[in-house]
Amino acid sequence: MFIGIVSLFLTVLVYLGAKKVYQRFPRVYTSPLLVTPAVLVGLLLLVNVPYESYNLGGGLLTDMLQPATVAFAIPLYKYFPVLKKYAVEIILNVAVGSCIAIISTALIAKWLHLGTGLIDSLVPRSVTTPIAMNVSEMIGGMPAVTAVFVILTALLGTVIGPMVIRYFRIDNEIARGVLLGTSAHGAGTSKAFELSSVSGTISSVSMILAAIMTLCAAPFLLSFM
């Protein structure tokens, strides 16, 4: 139990430290999403603490991911008129983006001759962690592996997303939000809020819709592949 408590506080401290570093040196390789797990893995290996012992405390943070999504209700309420006005455009774009993410991931994985379990673990990588892990378990994947790919997708999305926005000169706040929320879930939403509160809110909606659509569409689409 003591190790679990230490693990919990250590995880929070490492994350806060990584966040401070990222604020001062905002680079891809200083992202807390990358630095925090790398430091924690290094520390666990150094002191020879098994993952099971760490997860007694660290796992509590994973359990908090689901209720944490409730916080997105605040901007949703604030910008409800905007959401209502562009509901059809948002839903259609997120639906297309989610299906493309599922199909392209599965096809590339099959082309690389990856095992079925790994393919099923990769497919839900584009949605927020709690739902991605649930979808992975539902279709026969490995939730822990899925969580890793979710983080990698978030990192790539927060780097490539703004580049796409700049290159194609996407000035529309709705389009920016849909792009980042659908492709990079929570991390993309955080980046969208840096652009504007409207983009962040649309990104929140897109992230939630993408999660629901992936939950429903992934088992169906994979049955044809």
From Swiss-Prot:
Keyword Iron among UniProt keywords: no
> Where is this protein localized, as stated in its record?
Cell membrane
Query: Where are the bilayer-spanning segments?
Result: 1-21, 31-51, 56-76, 88-108, 145-165, 205-225
Matching InterPro entries: CidB/LrgB (IPR007300), YohK-like (IPR005261)
User: Which superkingdom is the protein from?
Assistant: Bacteria
Q: Does the keyword Cell membrane apply?
A: yes
Taken from the UniProt entry, a GO cellular component term is:
plasma membrane
**What's the short name of a Pfam family annotated to this entry?**
LrgB
Q: Which UniProt keywords apply?
A: Cell membrane, Membrane, Transmembrane, Transmembrane helix
Question: What is its membrane topology?
Answer: Multi-pass membrane protein
What family does the database annotate? Belongs to the YohK (E.coli)/YwbG (IPA-22R) (B.subtilis) family.
The entry's protein name is: Uncharacterized protein YwbG
| Organism field | Bacillus subtilis (strain 168)
